Amino acid sequence: MKKILTLFAVVGLMAFSSCSDDDNDNVDYDTFPYAFEIKNVDLGRVTDNEYNLKSTFNFEINDNLRDDETVLIYRLTDIVNSNTPVWQLIPRSVYFNNGDVIDYYFDFSKIDFIITARASFNLINAPDFINDQTFRVVLVPSDLAASVNKNNYLEVMKAAKLNESQVQKINF
């Protein structure tokens, strides 16, 4: 009888030890952090007070956006000490002392994106805000975007494990 119980115990142990649920079915291995920079671009006129830039992800990264990716776009607003860029997350509003305002914002689909500057005045009178603009587009998994301070470009890059050498530079 002891031999039969031992046999059942060994067979049972082998049967249950081979069953596991670590197949990682819920892991999205296609989503990856990615960053690219659109340098020195002039936004195109839509109306006197609205200018934009349209592009496709396929053009920028040779692929469309995936379901679980979040798009973060930063605008270069300054350079400190000739080598330290200042990146501001958009959407962003720039207010002037006279009450005028410029809003930078973007929208996107899985295929394309549009970065827009819209003002309460004719933007041709403020070329510094529409010409020679530089933007950083960072694509990160949505769960990472939910857990990091998106306003801080450096924190986003650190959390995404991206460094400056991995940012693809694109000249329009």
For each of these PLM feature ranges, what is it?
Residues 1-4:
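Positively charged n-region of N-terminal signal peptides that target proteins for export
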Residues 6-13:
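Sec-dependent N-terminal signal peptides
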Residues 15-18:
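C-terminal motif of bacterial Sec signal peptides marking the signal peptidase cleavage site
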Residues 20-23:
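Bacterial signal peptide processing site
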Residues 28-172:
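First exposed extracellular module after export/assembly in secreted or surface-exposed proteins
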